[in-house]
């Protein structure tokens, strides 16, 4: 009896051990719609680093920002295209953002102080208005903001704006020229331009020689055509000289430009080539004396003269006369001769000494001197 009792207790102990080793069932519930069904884990997620796209090195530099806006017919403003075509007679209003705006426009408008053009500076923008436009107004209109540090100002290259405006008119294909015959100087060390600009960007333009009569091809090597400038001679030489004209065709119509005389310049660019010569280096009292300062230069380069003379401190009265003319030296070579003459009447002892002439052009200046003695 005891044996059976012990055996029963042993079996009951093993049964209770098996029940204790089992995991109790989980209290499951239905997941709601949209609930994440991915089981959470204890793994640490690596932080995602956003990829940075490579940029061109040029992007790191400040880009030029167009500050120009054009007034439209509907009263709104928009950035103008690089080239704009308008009918002659239309008005133009351009605005450029900035408190200190400067403008550039066709020189034709500035030369004659044209009242049709108005430039104003408002608090936040500059304004340019052109009314009753003509084909002669065709050209580049640009603006830029001026940066100033005290009295020193410079142009802000990052804030500019520009547009080239064609003012078209029926039967007028070329921008009018102030004369019927223009001179273009050919310098061997810089480009030369035959300025036959058109009023319509769609016009086909060709260059022609008057004699012998033939078309001069714009081959892109020696000569190129730029509708904003005209025909550009990239490397002028003496063979290019002669009389030429342009021919434009558009809309089934053609037109001939004014004629251009191409003259080759033999004098190299640089400071004035200057000489000085006195009518006499020994002068008696009471006689008159003249000192001549001469410059040989390029036909289209102006020269300014300045004199220093012995009687200047004593306010000695003198006469100074400046002149210039073109001289032809054969084979079509042309030179500009500029002269300045200082004349002293009734020579006195205070007039004896050094006569110094300084000639200046855009490329520099040259000073020469000669002495005049009292005899």
Swiss-Prot record:
**First and last residue of the signal peptide:** 1-17
An example Pfam family from this entry, by short name, is Ig_3
Q: What is its main location?
A: secreted
Query: Keywords in UniProt for this one?
Result: Disulfide bond, Glycoprotein, Immunoglobulin domain, Repeat, Secreted, Signal
Task: Outline the extent of the Ig-like C2-type domain.
Answer: 62-159, 272-375
Biased composition range(s): Basic residues: 40-50
- Chain positions covered by the region annotation Disordered: 19-63
Its subcellular locations are: Secreted
Q: Which cysteines are joined by disulfide bonds?
A: 96-143, 293-357
Per the UniProt entry, the glycosylated residues are: 219
Gene Ontology, cellular component aspect: extracellular region
Question: Sorted alphabetically, which SMART domains does this protein's record hold?
Answer: IG (SM00409)
Q: How does it assemble?
A: Forms a complex composed of PDGFRL, TNK2 and GRB2.
Q: Which PANTHER family match?
A: PLATELET-DERIVED GROWTH FACTOR RECEPTOR LIKE, PLATELET-DERIVED GROWTH FACTOR RECEPTOR-LIKE PROTEIN
Protein's name according to its UniProt entry: Platelet-derived growth factor receptor-like protein
